[in-house]
Amino acid sequence: MKLRIFEIVFAAMMIASIGGATAAGAQSSPAREPVAPDSGPKTLLEGILGSTEKDKGKEGSDGEEHLDADRPHFPEATTTVGKGRAILESGYTFTKKGDSFLSHTVPEALLRVGMFADWFEFRIGQDTLHQRQTVEEVTATANGAKDLYLGVKLALTEQKGWLPATVVIPQMTVPTGSAEVTAGRVLPGVNVDFGWEVIKDVFNIELLVANNFVQDELGNSRHELATGLTGAFQLTKKLELFAEWDAFYPTAGASPASRHYAVAGAVYFVTPNLQLDMRAGVGLNHNSNDFLAGVGFAARY
């Protein structure tokens, strides 16, 4: 009988020892961090040259960042939306020059869709124009849909030190607009955007160099070089303030003089996938409009 009791006690002690060792081992072993799924190269250069293991380890380490919309800055974002994601942007802009010029543009709709790879983005946009212009006491109006915008954005490089993040946007408008507004022809162009994160999560610099054919005041097409330089300050995780200098340099056509604007605004991130924006600006020379203002939003899906 005593032997039987001893065997039972011994067996219980062995079971308890094994269970304790297992629990201790589980507690001492560090929990494995979830491995981020491989979403492929973020830029075209990375897709060609490949990424390092160090770069891969950085992916997915933080929570989802807020969307990087093209609006309301004149320079576009130096990121693409990502494969399988989409961003819809929309807004309204009011422009005025004394009593001689007044325009409203709405909805400034731009749909950006990530396709094929994280570095490739398809873009389609539509807008309407309501404009009144007086020249030598003769007033003309133009109202209706503008030409359809089509383009792609290619993320070329991410920032490496002082080398900027870079994207290129081949684009065009096709003559689908109303009779009073359409250019009546395809107008091609290409934008190149550069971005520097100077102080992480605090201060960014953006630069746009745009070469596009546009419609002039006489309805003819002309080449125009445009530049935009923006400084963006992230005051909090939800609030960004920015200031920029935008310039337009026609190379021919009815208005060969340049136009310059100083613009400032704010972006409020309601959620990581929704932002609201507002901006206002003034013309810096005689050829520019006196004042512009606008509001808008962007949503990521």
What are these regions (language model features)?
Residues M1-F10:
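Bacterial N-terminal signal peptides that target proteins for export
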